[in-house]
């Protein structure tokens, strides 16, 4: 299982995407969901697939690199392998 995490420069995003700039995050979410990624939090997306996982990361990076406003506003983008993904939300909330 692999994940993608990215950070965008908001001032550049506002200029390149326009207002409301936060809709850009919805657009990215839709694109990544089409490639099998699920939004977890912030700008972190996980692909839970057991097959061709690195290929899915490549497809996602390739797709994102074709979005002009994303290319101009991305500050950092990382892909990483997830060995264990534990949800501690209930422990914290109870």
Swiss-Prot record:
InterPro entries: VapD, Virulence_VapD/CRISPR_Cas2. It is an enzyme of class 3 (hydrolase). Changing residue 13 to A: Nearly complete loss of ribonuclease activity. It holds the Pfam family CRISPR_Cas2. One of its GO terms (molecular function) is nuclease activity. Its EC number is 3.1.-.-. The keyword Repressor does not apply. Changing residue 37 to A: Protein unstable. Keywords: Hydrolase, Nuclease, RNA-binding, Virulence. The keyword Coiled coil does not apply. There is no VapD ortholog in strain J99. Cleaves ssRNA, mostly between U:A; cleavage is not dependent on mono- or divalent cations. Can cleave RNAs as short as 6 nucleotides. Belongs to the VapD ribonuclease family. Homodimer. This is Endoribonuclease VapD.
């Amino acid at each position: 299982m692999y994940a993608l995490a990215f950070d965008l420069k908001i001032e550049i995003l506002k200029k390149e995407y326009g207002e409301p700039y936060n809709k850009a995050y919805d657009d990215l979410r839709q694109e990544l969901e089409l490639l099998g990624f699920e939004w977890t939090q912030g700008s972190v997306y996980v692909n839970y697939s057991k097959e061709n996982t690195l290929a899915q990361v490549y497809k996602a990076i390739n797709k994102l690199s074709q979005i002009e406003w994303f290319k101009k506003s991305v500050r950092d983008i990382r892909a990483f392998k997830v060995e264990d993904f534990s949800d501690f939300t209930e422990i914290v909330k109870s």
